[in-house]
Amino acid sequence: MVALRNGHLRHSKGAALTRWRALVFKAAYEAARGLNVDVPLDGPVRLRLVFVLPRPKRPRFWVPAVKPDLDKLVRAVGDALCPSSGPRVLREDSRIVHVDAHKVYADYPIQPGLLCWVSSVEGVRK
């Protein structure tokens, strides 16, 4: 859903999306620094993403074939790793060359959230 504000289209859930991206960035940045990884990464990378969604009381499907759309979730992660200002995990989100993404329902002990792995693509020629 979008809303028109000051002549510009804006996502109606923009504030929540901004907070979510900030949390994803903070977790990824701190993980990279904790592993002594120099950021921002400036080579080809692959992402492995598992979006863990809350399980409804009566799910229609055994997997979350429901909103939010997987492609939009993946895009939000790319945007989170490469914010428009400040420090970054990736120099550019165009450095993402492979994505393996899944949506699953949360089951104890796994809580809703995001599991994210970023790895460099080996064999890059200079």
Give residue ranges: language-model regions.
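Acidic, proline/glycine-enriched N-terminal capping motif
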Residues: 1-126
